[in-house]
Amino acid sequence: MPFDNAYEAITEENDHTHWAFGTGFDDPLAGIDTAVPPGMDRDDLAADCLMFGDDALIMSHRLAEWCTNAPELEDEVALANIALDLLGQARLLLSRSAQVSGSGTEDTLAYLRDEHEFRNVRLAELPRRNFAHEIVRLLVFSTWRLAILTRLVDSPDPVLAAIAAKDVKELTYHRNYAAG
């Protein structure tokens, strides 16, 4: 393989060699200085990224439970795509938290913590009940998260700001889907 890793193989600059129709994949962190800005508290930044990452991770798992269980195929596909968006958000946020805190990797944070160490909002972890309840939960969750991440687009941390800018686009779709 002419690339050092799979991630390198799927970036835009390598589209012409691998994909018939392009990947549509843009790295939201390409060219961004990952150093924590002077005057910013590393512990607070790591904790915030961890909390937002946990919210997205847990909600993505809950939404994935609807695969083969939603009332219509279109809803299954929509919820699966939203779950994948949230999983992508979780990966970036957990990676940033791990990088800033020096506490391992995104996988360490996602898989090697005890249940009580997760810092997600309770809304994200509620068990699946019925489809109507899930759509209301998604509407509340995505509206709340969209409001927070819209403000974080102006974060002094350039990495968090870039992640938020990407996530705002996705969350707008999530909210609009849930609003019907």
Residue ranges and their predicted role:
Residues 55-63, 89, 93, 141-148, ...:
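Amphipathic, well-ordered alpha-helical segments in soluble domains
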Residues 52-55, 82, 138, 167:
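Amphipathic alpha-helix face/heptad-repeat signature
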Residues 5-6, 36-50, 58-71, 75-77:
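Basic, Lys/Arg-rich alpha-helical nucleic-acid-recognition elements, primarily the DNA-binding modules
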Residues 3-13, 83-113, 178-179:
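Conserved alpha-helical segments that form or flank metal/cofactor-binding pockets of metalloenzymes
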Residues 1-41:
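Extreme N-terminal leader/anchor segments
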Residues 123-177:
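Internal, conserved structured core segments that host functional sites
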Residues 30-50, 112-138, 155:
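Acidic/His metal-coordination segments adjacent to aromatic residues that form catalytic metal sites
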Residues 59-81, 144-160:
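Helix-loop segments that flank and shape redox-cofactor active sites
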